[in-house]
């Protein structure tokens, strides 16, 4: 069973509107600070976070105790201009766990499965066509992956550059996701008890594929 924690900045819209029309630079600065804290504190307990709309974020918290999650949220509260709250959900897939957030929680057990993907020859494509071209290419790829994830129960997120992170229900799911991806990609898949350890293993697998100049999937357990 997988566990997802959803983090919400309560009253965030009202706070932004209170700043007046000359506010966007303030909003972006605050969002950057919260995003930095999110990654710093959640990964310190072995969880794997990512922002959604900035007023909402989530974290894969399989095998992480609720008390530890609460401690992290308390740290984020200290730098947030508004209150911060969270809920947890457990499910057979990361998507189902997200959808169950706020329901009666169960125990998460088993392993975390995370993929770290990049696009082959994206640097050459950037040099030829510019960064905006590659950025849009990645966005279209994530959209394609999201469509496949609806049935598989995975969640996909853009990490920057040409990097995509996927929270998977199992190792086999990555091969099903890639059936619809038209680009040549390298993917590291990590399997571990704690989510961030799984991501580290996924990155190790991706680095191996890069060094070897290979295309496809490398699973690291």
UniProtKB/Swiss-Prot annotation:
UniProt enzyme class: hydrolase
Q: Name one GO biological process term.
A: biosynthetic process
Keyword check for Nucleotide-binding: yes
Q: Which reaction does it catalyse?
A: GTP + 3 H2O = 2-amino-5-formylamino-6-(5-phospho-D-ribosylamino)pyrimidin-4(3H)-one + 2 phosphate + 2 H(+)
Q: Name one GO molecular function term.
A: GTP cyclohydrolase IIa activity
Stated EC number for the protein is: 3.5.4.29
Which parts pass through the membrane?
A: none
InterPro entries this protein is in? Answer: GTP_CycHdrlase_3, Nucleotide_cyclase, Rev_trsase/Diguanyl_cyclase
Alphabetic keyword roster? GTP-binding, Hydrolase, Nucleotide-binding
Protein family per UniProt: Belongs to the archaeal-type GTP cyclohydrolase family.
> What is the role of the protein in this entry?
Catalyzes the formation of 2-amino-5-formylamino-6-ribofuranosylamino-4(3H)-pyrimidinone ribonucleotide monophosphate and inorganic phosphate from GTP. Also has an independent pyrophosphate phosphohydrolase activity.
Q: Give the protein's recorded name.
A: GTP cyclohydrolase III
Q: Which gene encodes it?
A: gch3
């Amino acid at each position: 069973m997988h566990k997802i924690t959803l983090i919400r900045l309560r009253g965030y819209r009202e706070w932004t509107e209170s700043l007046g029309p000359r506010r966007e630079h303030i909003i972006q600065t605050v969002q950057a600070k919260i995003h930095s804290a999110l990654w710093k504190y959640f990964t310190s307990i072995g969880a794997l976070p990512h922002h959604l709309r900035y007023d909402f974020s989530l974290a894969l918290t399989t095998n992480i105790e609720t008390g530890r999650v609460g401690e992290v949220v308390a740290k984020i509260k200290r730098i947030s201009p508004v209150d911060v709250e969270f809920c947890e959900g457990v499910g057979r897939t990361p998507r189902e766990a997200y959808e169950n957030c706020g329901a009666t929680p169960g125990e998460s057990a088993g392993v975390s499965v995370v993929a770290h993907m990049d696009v082959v020859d994206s640097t050459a494509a950037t040099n030829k066509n510019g960064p905006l071209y590659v950025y849009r290419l990645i966005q279209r790829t994530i959209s394609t992956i999201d469509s496949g994830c609806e049935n598989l129960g995975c969640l996909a997120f853009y990490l920057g550059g040409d990097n995509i992170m996927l929270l998977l229900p199992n190792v086999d799911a990555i091969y099903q996701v890639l059936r619809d991806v038209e680009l040549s990609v390298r993917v590291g898949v990590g399997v571990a008890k704690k989510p961030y350890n799984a991501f580290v293993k996924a990155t190790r697998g991706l680095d191996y594929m890069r060094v070897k100049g290979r295309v496809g999937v490398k699973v690291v357990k």
